[in-house]
Curated annotation (Swiss-Prot):
NCBIfam families: L12. One of its GO terms (cellular component) is cytosolic large ribosomal subunit. This is Large ribosomal subunit protein bL12. The gene is rplL. The keyword Phosphoprotein does not apply. Disulfide bonds: none annotated. Forms part of the ribosomal stalk which helps the ribosome interact with GTP-bound translation factors. Is thus essential for accurate translation. The lineage of its organism: Bacteria, Pseudomonadati, Pseudomonadota, Alphaproteobacteria, Rhodobacterales. Transmembrane segments: none annotated. Keywords: Ribonucleoprotein, Ribosomal protein. One of its GO terms (molecular function) is mRNA binding. It comes from Ruegeria sp. (strain TM1040) (Silicibacter sp.). Homodimer. Part of the ribosomal stalk of the 50S ribosomal subunit. Forms a multimeric L10(L12)X complex, where L10 forms an elongated spine to which 2 to 4 L12 dimers bind in a sequential fashion. Binds GTP-bound translation factors. Belongs to the bacterial ribosomal protein bL12 family.
Amino acid sequence: MADLKALAESIVGLTLLEAQELKTILKDEYGIEPAAGGAVMVAAGGDAAGGAAEEEKTEFDVVLKNAGASKINVIKEVRGITGLGLKEAKELVEAGGKIKEGVDKAEAEDIKGKLEAAGAEVELA
């Protein structure tokens, strides 16, 4: 029972990017399709984990608030920043959320600048 509780806590603590990677692994290796509401639940759990990073102020999370009118350019930038595939980057841009987490201020500002230049609304948390 303790193992299941630890597994559940690990899943709830995933960032949006980690949840996307988990979804891909489950789909490709095990043939498990995600439920329709899964992304919304994981995004809420990812925000809870971001609270600890805010207290430190040495690490920042880059959060995509809105892709803006030129979503294709934003998807291209997200792919370049994260190394995700086209489909995963598109899903991340459409859902919004953390693009990168736990980065130093200089890198976070650089990523924010690139995404804003592509037309996105970005916030550092």
